[in-house]
Amino acid sequence: VTMAAADPERYGHIMEEAHVSIAAFGGTFLMMVALTYFIDDRKDVDWFATLECRLRQCASIRGIEIAIVLAMIIAFSSFLPRHEAATFLFAGAAGLLTFLGVEILGHVLDSSRDARRMVRQGGLGAFLYLEMLDASFSFDGVIGAFALTRNLFLIAIGLGIGAMYVRSVTIMLVEMGTLSKFRYLEHGAFYSILLLALIMYAQSFMHIPEVVTGLVGVVLILLSLRSSLVHNRLHQRS
């Protein structure tokens, strides 16, 4: 914090040098989030039926998500110089272990026998999961923000406002039951997470404009919303 306040140029340079590890860690965590959603035999609604049916069928293969993510980490690290590839592999493994650690902690807390304690501990597990998810999204935003300003405090304020807005909208959608009204909206969100993970991986060795990163999510959400509206109209007619 002292360096960020006293020497923002140096701090920004250090952050930019760490972009490989940030991309690997955040991309791995987000990819595990997306794959865990799609590779689930309890999932009964498909947006892209052919792809999602095949992914759901893979749920019987134990640890398939981990294998896919490890394969992606190794594949993307092959595009990097040797010293950066080692950093990418280490950070990717750290992101994978972090996700598994949060998942294990959530299962341990949810297995409590005492109902009241289970609610409190389950809330803690969900809180930790959301914090890690939010951090993974923010990693990409921090690097992009240095193109606009070197002031860490302005970056923190901007990311904080964005996170608060997104969480407020999410809570509103849950309370209004919007996800149940729009059949494919959740799918659009997880496809956005999956593509963001791939973009973060790719950013480790090539430049991808921030506008592309933002538009990918917006387009997928809008497409899923459109598909949901079409489905609702067809369902009402029948």
Predicted regions and their residues:
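Multi-pass alpha-helical transmembrane bundle typical of ion/small-solute transporters
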Residues: 1-238
